[in-house]
């Protein structure tokens, strides 16, 4: 996946997909009552990016639904997966369940159209804090209570805090998650990637490829340079999050990579570990 980073204004959906992204990441900020309120990142954010673009969350969901509903005038066939970067650090731990409940209610109504020919993209709920694992429980139980447990087939999970992978596994156990796991690793583009290195991403890939690992897919962020793109592909990641989708697309076209990698389509299962 080429994952467009920080797509928080509606017009940016077209912009990033047209540059080559088949996935986008959206920041979701919450109000004091744990309602998802805006698609908004805020300051500070990645270097060479405008941090303060925003929409109302439900307005963005409606636009996203159009972009991922076949037959709609705004439809993008290649946009297959959406990561919601949930900014839950503004909430108390005890609010995590409510945040999940309200997120599910909003998505059900405005994105999935109450289960009636809604948007088709796969969704990854990315949570920054392991202590907020009950967000997953709240989300899952709400879809079940509303009569749409089948929509969980479209939902995957990520803990984005760069935590120790053993701790991540424990949080999933508490949340009752046994699949659909994307593991993120990375750092803001303001810090050169070689300072932090790619070791943790390699550990995540090793977990993914082991017989008893809990990870299905690994993505690395935020990659804007040709050299870092090659390094991430060499490590065997499944997705690269970027501010410049065209850079990643160009590298994937290089002779060293174009026989080994291809862009995911809707026919690919994002929860299934790719076996060489």
Curated annotation (Swiss-Prot):
EC id: 4.6.1.-
InterPro entries: PLC-like_Pdiesterase_TIM-brl
Residues the record lists as binding Mg(2+): 25, 27, 85
Glycosylation sites: 253
Broad class of the protein's primary localization: secreted
Catalytic reaction list: an N-(acyl)-sphingosylphosphocholine = an N-(acyl)-sphingosyl-1,3-cyclic phosphate + choline; an N-(acyl)-sphingosylphosphoethanolamine = an N-(acyl)-sphingosyl-1,3-cyclic phosphate + ethanolamine; a 1-acyl-sn-glycero-3-phosphocholine = a 1-acyl-sn-glycero-2,3-cyclic phosphate + choline; a 1-acyl-sn-glycero-3-phosphoethanolamine = a 1-acyl-sn-glycero-2,3-cyclic phosphate + ethanolamine
Cellular compartment(s): Secreted
Keyword vocabulary terms for this entry: Cytolysis, Dermonecrotic toxin, Disulfide bond, Glycoprotein, Hemolysis, Lipid degradation, Lipid metabolism, Lyase, Magnesium, Metal-binding, Secreted, Toxin
A molecular function (GO) term: phosphoric diester hydrolase activity
Disulphide bridges, residue numbers: 45-51, 47-190
GO terms under biological process: killing of cells of another organism; lipid catabolic process
Tissue expression from the record: Expressed by the venom gland.
Tagged with keyword Lyase: yes
Cofactor binding comment, as recorded: Binds 1 Mg(2+) ion per subunit.
Active site as annotated: 5, 41
GO CC term, one of those recorded: extracellular region
Cofactors that this protein relies on: Mg(2+)
Function: Dermonecrotic toxins cleave the phosphodiester linkage between the phosphate and headgroup of certain phospholipids (sphingolipid and lysolipid substrates), forming an alcohol (often choline) and a cyclic phosphate. This toxin acts on sphingomyelin (SM). It may also act on ceramide phosphoethanolamine (CPE), lysophosphatidylcholine (LPC) and lysophosphatidylethanolamine (LPE), but not on lysophosphatidylserine (LPS), and lysophosphatidylglycerol (LPG). It acts by transphosphatidylation, releasing exclusively cyclic phosphate products as second products.
Family membership: Belongs to the arthropod phospholipase D family. Class II subfamily.
Protein name: Dermonecrotic toxin LdSicTox-alphaIB2
